């Protein structure tokens, strides 16, 4: 098999092309934007919108998810789903997270959904990226990588997490349904 071939071939460029095993073989545009700050929040809200309305939301200029303000790595967003407005925040860096938590505890702000990524700009600027000291933490380079992910999303055949066949199979065969007791127990964090 392929494992045996890999062990015998030192030049990996000579390995035959093949598809990834499930569940990693199929990707969605929503999954790709997970790599940028705000991407997980946006992908989750796309699916929430579909769950409530039965329709996929517009993406891009016509999206119901609106950026209200952006200051550095902090974005404040809002989405209206059938008359229910959700106030959201997306930020990157643990220092930003600490400041937001303190402001929320003091009652200075309220958010229904907060996404925090530890690395500035998100995973696109994280430890899994090639180490290039001239690149790290440069906002323009992070913005360029963000735009690459967004372009991939725009050109993806499947743009919504809930349309990923592997995710659908996982719910059908193991988690029962979104928000089921089993899914809630395994996937949701109440406190940490």
Task: Indicate residue ranges for each PLM-predicted region.
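Short, small-residue-biased leader/transition segments that mark boundaries at the very start
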Residues: 1-8
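A conserved mid-domain beta-alpha-beta active-site/ligand-binding segment of alpha/beta enzyme cores
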Residues: 10-13, 18-48, 53
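Flexible, glycine/charged-enriched surface loops at secondary-structure junctions
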Residues: 12-18, 54-68, 110-115, 160
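Accessory "access/gating" subregions that flank catalytic or transport cores
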Residues: 31, 35, 39-45, 56-95
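Local cysteine-cluster metal-coordination motifs and their immediate loop/turn environment
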Residues: 113-131
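Catalytic phosphate/nucleotide-handling subdomain of diverse soluble enzymes
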Residues: 131-150
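Short flanking/linker segments adjacent to small metal-binding domains or redox-active Cys/His motifs
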Residues: 161-192
């Amino acid at each position: 098999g392929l494992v045996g071939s890999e062990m015998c071939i030192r030049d990996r460029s000579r390995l035959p092309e093949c598809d990834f095993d499930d569940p990693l073989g199929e990707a969605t545009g929503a999954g790709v934007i997970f790599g940028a700050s705000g991407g997980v929040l946006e992908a989750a809200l796309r699916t929430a919108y579909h769950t409530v309305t039965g329709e996929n939301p517009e993406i891009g200029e016509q999206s119901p998810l609106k950026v209200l303000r952006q200051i550095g790595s902090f974005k404040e967003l809002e989405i209206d789903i059938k008359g229910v407005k959700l106030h959201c925040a997306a930020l990157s860096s643990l220092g930003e997270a600490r400041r937001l938590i303190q402001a929320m505890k003091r009652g200075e702000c309220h958010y229904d959904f907060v996404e925090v990524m530890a690395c500035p700009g998100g995973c696109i600027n994280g430890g899994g990226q090639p180490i290039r000291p001239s690149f790290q933490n440069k906002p323009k380079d992070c913005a360029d990588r963000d735009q690459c992910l967004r372009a991939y999303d725009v050109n993806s055949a499947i743009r919504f997490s809930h349309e990923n066949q592997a995710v659908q199979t996982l719910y059908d065969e193991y988690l029962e349904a979104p928000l089921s007791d089993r899914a809630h127990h395994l996937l949701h964090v109440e406190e940490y």
